[in-house]
């Protein structure tokens, strides 16, 4: 009857009558597992794969062994009912250290909070530029020009998206192709509210043909302020988020930036007759009291202090599919 060999690394069945001094190839040592490496204490080979470890050929020859090794002896645990509970307690003093409570994330405030006008800081460069152009004082000459019905050759059409200029009486008869809505910049996409042809490229956005036909508007008194797009970008540090709007010669007395903890509304008047509007639903929460606006001759920087020092994934909070459906229904 064939018997099972219990030598480590063998595990074969053998005939006791044919058992010789070199019939078994086995490991006399013990398994060693260290730093993900597996091997036997009796030989140097090591491997990280357990199946490979099991297939390591023994390093010693001898007789097959049919005796099952004894199971490891479990330590005897003596209990006495007479011992009091105090005697069973450990003989050292216990120190229970309570872990600090985790820092709770700031709960997102309601978007319906009242809006506050951010402080405007006007740079010396902007003051000099406005004085030079006489835009801040509004001279009598400018007023007369605005009230005049005369249209100068080369005057640009005031309709949004129209790039035509006045070339004479024939321009009065031309059909103007323009955008009747306002430019919208949202989550990296740029489009007009009237036709919603979205693009991520600013130059492509500027080149979009209008969706409405009508008459050119050549004079300021007919057009009022002209809403135009402005290139803008943003960056952040650990504690602040800064938006840069590239609008030249902005007018502080006609511009305002208002915000609450999660919303930002930007209204900038620049170069006398141009307006830029942008409403932003902020990704994070800001400290309105510590936020401000810096106006220079070439751009406007909106510096918003973060309510908590964390990295924003984006400037704007993405809208949910439900909100997009509700907006499409409203439109």
From Swiss-Prot:
Factors inducing expression: By Heat shock in a HSF1-dependent manner.
Gene Ontology biological process terms in this record: chaperone-mediated protein folding; negative regulation of Rho-dependent protein serine/threonine kinase activity; regulation of cellular response to heat; regulation of centrosome duplication
Residues found modified as Phosphothreonine: 47
Positions of the CHORD domain: 5-64, 157-216
InterPro entries tied to this protein: CHORD_dom, CHRD1, CS_dom, HSP20-like_chaperone
Residues involved in Zn(2+) 2 binding: 27, 42-43, 59
Gene null: resulting phenotype: Results in centrosome amplification and lethality. Cells become polyploid or undergo apoptosis. Embryos are no longer detected after 3.5 dpc.
Sites where the protein binds Zn(2+) 3: 157, 162, 176, 216
Region described as Interaction with HSP90AA1 and HSP90AB1: spans on this chain: 65-316
Annotated positions binding Zn(2+) 4: 179, 194-195, 211
PTM sites of type Phosphoserine: 51
Gene3D superfamilies hit by this protein: 2.60.40.790, 4.10.1130.20
Domain of life: Eukaryota
Region (Interaction with PPP5C): 2-77
Residues holding Zn(2+) 1: 5, 10, 24, 64
Keyword list, A-Z: Acetylation, Chaperone, Metal-binding, Phosphoprotein, Repeat, Stress response, Zinc
Entry comment describing in which tissues the protein is expressed: Ubiquitously expressed. Highly expressed in spleen, lung and brain (at protein level). Expressed in proliferating myoblasts and its expression remained steady after. Its expression undergoes diurnal and circadian changes in hypothalamus. Highly expressed during the dark-light transition (ZT20.5 (zeitgeber time 20.5) and ZT2.5).
Basic and acidic residues bias spans: 64-82
GO molecular function terms listed in the Swiss-Prot or TrEMBL record: ADP binding; ATP binding; Hsp90 protein binding; zinc ion binding
The protein's role, per its UniProt record: Regulates centrosome duplication, probably by inhibiting the kinase activity of ROCK2. Proposed to act as co-chaperone for HSP90. May play a role in the regulation of NOD1 via a HSP90 chaperone complex. In vitro, has intrinsic chaperone activity. This function may be achieved by inhibiting association of ROCK2 with NPM1. Plays a role in ensuring the localization of the tyrosine kinase receptor EGFR to the plasma membrane, and thus ensures the subsequent regulation of EGFR activity and EGF-induced actin cytoskeleton remodeling. Involved in stress response. Prevents tumorigenesis.
Quaternary structure annotation from Swiss-Prot or TrEMBL: Interacts with HSP90AA1, HSP90AB1 and PPP5C. Interacts with ROCK1 and ROCK2.
Entry protein name: Cysteine and histidine-rich domain-containing protein 1
Organism: Mus musculus (Mouse)
């Amino acid at each position: 009857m064939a018997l099972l060999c219990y030598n480590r690394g063998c595990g074969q069945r053998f005939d006791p009558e044919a058992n010789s001094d070199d019939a078994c190839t086995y490991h006399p040592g013990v398994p060693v597992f260290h730093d993900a490496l597996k091997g036997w204490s009796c030989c140097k080979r090591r491997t990280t794969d357990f199946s490979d470890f099991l297939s390591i050929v023994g390093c010693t020859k001898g007789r097959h062994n049919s005796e099952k090794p004894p199971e490891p002896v479990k330590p005897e645990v003596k209990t006495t009912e007479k011992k009091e509970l105090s005697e069973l307690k450990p003989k050292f003093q216990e120190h229970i250290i309570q872990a600090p409570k985790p820092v709770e994330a700031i709960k997102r405030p309601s978007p319906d909070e009242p809006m506050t006008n951010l402080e405007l800081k006007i740079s010396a460069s902007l003051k000099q530029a406005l004085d030079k152009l006489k835009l801040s004082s509004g001279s009598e000459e400018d007023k007369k020009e605005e009230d005049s019905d005369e249209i100068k050759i080369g005057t640009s059409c005031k309709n949004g998206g129209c790039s035509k200029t006045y070339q004479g009486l024939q321009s009065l008869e031309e059909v103007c192709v323009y955008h009747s809505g306002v430019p919208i910049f949202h989550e990296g996409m740029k489009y007009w509210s009237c036709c919603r042809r979205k693009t991520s490229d600013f130059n492509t956005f500027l080149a979009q043909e209008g969706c409405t036909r009508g008459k050119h508007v050549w004079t300021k008194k007919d057009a009022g302020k002209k809403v135009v797009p402005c290139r803008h970008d943003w960056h952040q540090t650990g504690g602040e988020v800064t938006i840069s709007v590239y609008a030249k010669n902005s007018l502080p007395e006609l511009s305002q930036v208002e915000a609450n903890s999660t919303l930002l509304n930007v209204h900038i008047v620049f170069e006398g007759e141009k307006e830029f509007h942008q409403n932003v639903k902020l990704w994070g929460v800001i400290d309105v009291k510590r936020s401000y606006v810096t106006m220079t001759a070439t751009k406007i920087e909106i510096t918003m202090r973060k309510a908590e020092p964390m990295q924003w994934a984006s400037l704007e909070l993405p809208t949910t599919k439900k909100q997009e459906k509700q907006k499409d229904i409203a439109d």
